[in-house]
Amino acid sequence: MNDHGQHNREGLERLRRLTSLSDAELAKDTGDGWTVATVLGHMAFFDRLLLLRWDTYEKDGVFAELTPNHFDLINYAGAGDWSALPPRAAVARCIEAAERAVARINALPEKVVAVVLETPRVALLERMLHWSPHLVQIERAIGREI
């Protein structure tokens, strides 16, 4: 298994353990007005966005480009909706979106993987690049490892 595949598998194992969080832990503040559940909604959104980016690549042969400014705008616009999710739904959506993203990545032809590895888009393959900082953020908020 390639490194990104192994890292994604390990990340999914950690994400699945989020089901053990209590309601109080899901409501913990993570900073900037976000709760643990908000972070999970954010993670689910970006894994679903990843699927659309792969759809675009498959259809058009090019990646849908996003600048750092786009991410800031998306986060600002999405935070209210992510915060409104019932906490248990945020957990379920996060895990489901991550599983779908990893399944899509695992199904990519090796030639596509090779193309991505030559670009600054490695996060399209290795989801832990996005998940890991958020998992650390969650662990800090709840005061324990997941």
Where are each of the predicted segments found?
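Alpha-helical bundle segments that constitute or directly flank the non-heme di-iron/ferroxidase center
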Residues: 1-23, 48-55, 129
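Generic detector of short, locally flexible boundary/turn motifs and exposed helical patches
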Residues: 2-6, 56-58, 65-68, 99-101
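Residue-level recognition of alpha-helical structural elements
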Residues: 4, 32, 83, 87-90, ...
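Hydrophobic packing residues in well-ordered alpha-helices of helical domains and bundles
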Residues: 4-12, 36, 87-94, 124-127, ...
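Acidic/histidine-rich alpha-helical segments that form the ligand environment
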Residues: 8-11, 17-20, 73-112
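Short, contiguous alpha-helical
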Residues: 26-73, 110-146
